[in-house]
Design a protein with these regions (language model features):
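Basic, Lys/Arg- and aromatic-enriched nucleic-acid-binding interface segment
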Residues: 40-72, 187
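Heptad-repeat coiled-coil/leucine-zipper oligomerization helices
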Residues: 253, 260, 267, 274-277, ...
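Conserved tyrosine-mediated DNA breakage-rejoining catalytic core shared by Y-recombinases
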Residues: 74-133
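Flexible interdomain linker/hinge and immediately adjacent N-terminus
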Residues: 13-45, 117
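Non-catalytic DNA-binding core/recognition domains of DNA-processing enzymes
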Residues: 1-13, 126
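Catalytic-site neighborhood detector that most strongly recognizes the C-terminal catalytic loop/helix
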Residues: 208-259
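Short, basic (Lys/Arg/His-rich) helix/loop patches that form interaction surfaces
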Residues: 142-149, 161-206, 210-213
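C-terminal catalytic core of Y-nucleophile DNA break-rejoin enzymes
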Residues: 116-136, 146-167
Length: 296
């Protein structure tokens, strides 16, 4: 503000004194307490009455912590890229991707997202149940889908209205001026659930794309592999419908090794069958030779 006033005065533009602001009469937003946030029970109830699209958004928001703006900016291409470490190089069509991952239950997708608020990219992840829900929703889409198509086909206004409808149907009421069940509350759920599951606040901030100060941003860089490993350790905290206490989330490399091992086992089995056939033919041939020798 001082810079603006200095600019005007420098060019001899008269600036009237502004009235002083009385902090006592400013309407401040009501504080949000932990007990007022939706817990897993509430989120499960919301999930049960939601449309397939909103089911996908709810699970994605809870497990990724993405803000509404970033959620709506994601494309099909972004989603395929987030799944790429689990896919062969030639899988680029979204329906091929969904078919390929149909029987894989431990996919933790990695999103590189540009946060509009800070204009910086950050990494976050979403849970296997969110991936399943997104895939189920995409299979119901009736419009042609390209890499540039939005991942969630919904406008900002309709998304807000959908959250409001769920909130009012469940009778969840309001927290201050806002309804209790809304997208920003799911972002708060994500942060609080991870923090209360003993994830460090720095890691939580990294997953939510919150800005570091310039010095920290320049000198302290998060290792993506370590961040994903840390996220997987706390995955049960942000998983809503699935019991993941005993879920073994395997690395893509290990999954690939398992698949290659299955192929090798199949090939070895085929080779053994061929050897058995050759042994049988050899015995038959020796029998014929012996009979011919005895006859002569």
């Amino acid at each position: 503000m001082n810079c603006i006033i200095f600019f005007y005065k420098f060019y001899d533009i008269e600036v009237w004194d502004l009235p002083k602001v009385n902090d006592k009469i400013i309407q401040k937003p009501a504080p949000i307490y932990f007990k007022e946030m939706p817990d897993k029970k509430v989120i499960r109830e919301a999930f049960q009455i939601a449309s397939p699209l909103m089911k996908a958004i709810i699970l994605f928001s809870c497990s990724s912590g993405c803000a509404r703006t970033e959620t709506l900016s994601l494309t099909i291409g972004d989603y395929i890229k987030a799944l790429s470490e689990y896919l062969p190089n030639n899988r680029r069509d979204i329906f091929d991707v969904i078919d390929y991952l149909n029987d894989v239950d431990d996919v933790v997708s990695t999103f590189s997202i540009l946060r509009k608020k800070t204009n910086k990219y950050y990494l976050t992840y979403c849970s296997p149940e969110a991936v399943k829900s997104i895939n189920a929703y995409l299979l119901l889409r009736d419009r042609p889908i390209t890499d540039e198509s939005p991942l969630f086909q919904i406008s900002r206004t309709y998304m807000v209205q959908s959250f409001e409808m769920i909130n009012d149907t469940l009778g969840l009421g309001r927290v201050g001026r806002y309804r209790r069940f809304r997208s920003h509350m799911l972002r708060k759920f994500h942060a609080s659930a991870l923090y209360n599951d003993c994830m460090s606040i720095d890691k939580v901030n990294d997953l939510q794309g919150k800005a570091k100060n310039k010095t920290d941003a320049a000198y302290f860089m998060t290792n993506p592999d370590d961040l994903k490993y840390e996220y997987i350790q706390h995955l049960p905290a942000v998983t809503i419908n699935t019991d993941v206490e005993k879920l073994s989330v395997k690395s893509p490399q290990f999954i690939q090794m398992e698949k290659e091992n299955e192929v090798l086992k199949s090939e070895v089995g085929d080779m053994r069958n061929e050897l058995e056939e050759m042994r049988g033919l050899k015995k038959e041939l020796l029998g014929i030779i012996n009979k011919v020798s005895e006859g002569s």
